[in-house]
Amino acid sequence: MDTMRERFAAVTSRLLDEDPRLAVVLAVITSDSFADAGRRHPDRVIDLGIREQLLISTAGGLALAGLRPVAHTFASFLVERPFEQIKLDLNHLDVGAVLVSAGASYDMSAGGRTHQSPGDVALLDTLPGWTVHVPGHPDEAETLLREAYQAEGRVYVRLSTETNEQPLPAKPTVLKRGRRGTVVAVGPLADPVLAATSDLDVTVLYTPTVRPFPAQLLRETLAAPEVILVEPYLAGTSIPATARALSGQPTRILGLGVASKELRHYGTPGDHQKAHGLDPSSLHRSITAFLTA
């Protein structure tokens, strides 16, 4: 199976041939995969080198010129480092763009803290008007990327090397129904959540899109006041959105995800998953403890 990042490069390269509005802005990362497309479309495949602030500003300028820019690099260099440019050159100018990241929270664990970005979605939550996709499989990534390229607004697509074994619908979906509570599984954490809740009487909702938050589906399927969010980025990021969705109803919310504590050992992505309590056995303990409290 190809990775989400490989699928992104392949699909986007094909669409550059079909859509004259599409432009790709790179900062070295993944540039080899766009080499052929760059030779075919040298005016719409732009590698700026390791200058991430310029990456975003260039995307804003292309949007002002009527193009649909796609800016890509690792998440920490796409959202965190050039955040001021996102705020000013995209949001303040009110132009659309697609930001496509790789690396996620700890995919590149050997790269150390500089290449880890668990706070990216929370940071974008401080700005209005963003759609945020967190696909759980390359097939979902392709669907969501195609939708993002056809849209007009600001879209963040968060790619990861962590994937579910099988693709799920690229929209909010009920995977399991129960009576004791609701677990919302985001993107690549669907498989760990299903394994963790196999013996629990809970509803499991899956969503590869977290902004806008799937409020209506949550309200329609809620069978008990307990809601557990399992997100592959900073723990609790979607608690405010969940609280707004269930305003006026008695609710208890638990946010599971990447902890804010600093881990100063490299390890593997699997080591980080366990350290943050996102493996099936840890999730089972956390969810069971919350439901029985």
Would you name each region that the model predicts?
Residues 72, 100, 135, 158, ...:
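Generic beta-sheet signal
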Residues 1-145, 149-152, 160-293:
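Thiamine diphosphate
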Residues 154-156:
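Short, structured loop/turn "capping" segments at alpha-beta junctions
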